[in-house]
Amino acid sequence: MSGRQGGKAKPLKAAKKTEKDLSEEDVEFKKKQQEEAKKIKEMAAKAGQRGPLLGGGIKKSGKK
């Protein structure tokens, strides 16, 4: 057999992330996305406090 022996093989090293040069448009776009995500999260929290919207009305029993 080859030189490799039993056991777990070492994982390959991931390349280091380099800082990207972002243009002003990219920075504005990221900021806008973060603000929208924050708004959606706040709206979801408000909706969760109220409880279910449906559930009223006449409930039918299974009997006939």
UniProtKB/Swiss-Prot annotation:
Transmembrane segments: none annotated. Keywords: Coiled coil. Residues 1-64 are annotated as: Disordered. InterPro entries: TMA7. Residues 28-44 have a biased composition (Basic and acidic residues). The keyword Coiled coil applies. Residues 21-50 form a coiled coil. It comes from the Eukaryota. It holds the Pfam family TMA7. Residues 53-64 have a biased composition (Gly residues). PANTHER family: TRANSLATION MACHINERY-ASSOCIATED PROTEIN 7 (PTHR28632). Belongs to the TMA7 family. This is Translation machinery-associated protein 7 homolog.
